[in-house]
């Protein structure tokens, strides 16, 4: 079996779509019997009081599709436009709501994305 370096693995992951990375995380969780959510939840406890000021100065936001609403086709079109995903990937993302559409974006970009998705009939949350 070929041995991959950490840099090769990072390069491979950086070329993946959001859906592919989410699938990778899910498979790693299953294989190793762990949960990525548990790790994230444990991190703020270690930070204690230092985590509070950081929350006030948040500069990166995640746009979460909560529900596609009644006009799912228009929502899929907007998701494709915003993410560059193919039709099947965009449909899977919309069908799997709640799911992140974009992560680590500026507040202005997050609000623009939210506006476009809500105009298409979706329910969206910015975190």
Swiss-Prot record:
Domain of life from the UniProt record: Bacteria
Segments traversing the membrane: none
UniProt cross-references to SUPFAM superfamilies, sorted A to Z: ClpS-like, Ribosomal protein L7/12, oligomerisation (N-terminal) domain
Gene Ontology cellular-component annotations: cytosolic large ribosomal subunit
Function comment: Forms part of the ribosomal stalk which helps the ribosome interact with GTP-bound translation factors. Is thus essential for accurate translation.
NCBIfam families in UniProt: L12 (TIGR00855)
Family: Belongs to the bacterial ribosomal protein bL12 family.
Protein name: Large ribosomal subunit protein bL12
UniProt source species: Hydrogenobaculum sp. (strain Y04AAS1)
């Amino acid at each position: 079996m070929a041995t991959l370096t950490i840099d090769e693995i990072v390069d491979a992951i950086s070329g993946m779509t959001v859906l592919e990375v989410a699938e990778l995380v899910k498979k790693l969780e299953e294989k190793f019997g762990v949960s990525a959510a548990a790790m994230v939840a444990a991190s703020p406890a270690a930070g204690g009081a230092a985590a509070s000021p950081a929350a006030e100065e948040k500069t990166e936001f995640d746009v979460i599709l909560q529900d596609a609403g009644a006009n799912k086709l228009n929502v899929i079109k907007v998701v494709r436009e915003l993410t560059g995903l193919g039709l099947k990937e965009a449909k899977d993302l919309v069908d799997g709501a709640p799911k992140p559409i974009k992560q680590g974006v500026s507040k202005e970009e997050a609000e623009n994305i939210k506006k476009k998705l809500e105009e298409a009939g979706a329910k969206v949350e910015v975190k």
